[in-house]
Amino acid sequence: KLGRESWDKKTDAQKKDIIAKGSDAIRRASREGSKLEKFILSELTKRKYKVQFHREQWLKNQNLETDLFIEDLRTVIEVDGPSHFEPVWGEENLIKNQRSDLEKTGLVLEQGLVLIRIKQTKRISNRYMRTVLNELLEVIDRIEKKFPEENKRYIEI
């Protein structure tokens, strides 16, 4: 309620400025990687995994890129933020994102790779990022011990 009261006290110009700054931050994160993507990249690299970040033009559809790719484990990691399941940019863009996700999932699995999708449904906090990292490390550990059978290569966290 407090946030709503604060918002209601803002002028239209202030509201417009806040929305523009928020939109810019989200667009920048989609180009440069989200905080969670960068955290995972950093932590995996510390653990000596060779991780390719925002790899482009290697799936059949050159417009698709993967967030993180561990080639030695034949594993792709996708971090799906709110725009993958909420109409952050409108209904049309949500549908477009979901179609793109389905296409990417199919292309990754077609190549015999593992796809780990991390669904970012909570606000980013250090605790949340550590929890996600621990779950991811458990999955990676299982993949290292035994590469999953074909019907078990799609994993959600």
Which sequence ranges carry the predicted segments?
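Nucleic-acid endo/exonuclease domains
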Residues: K1-I157
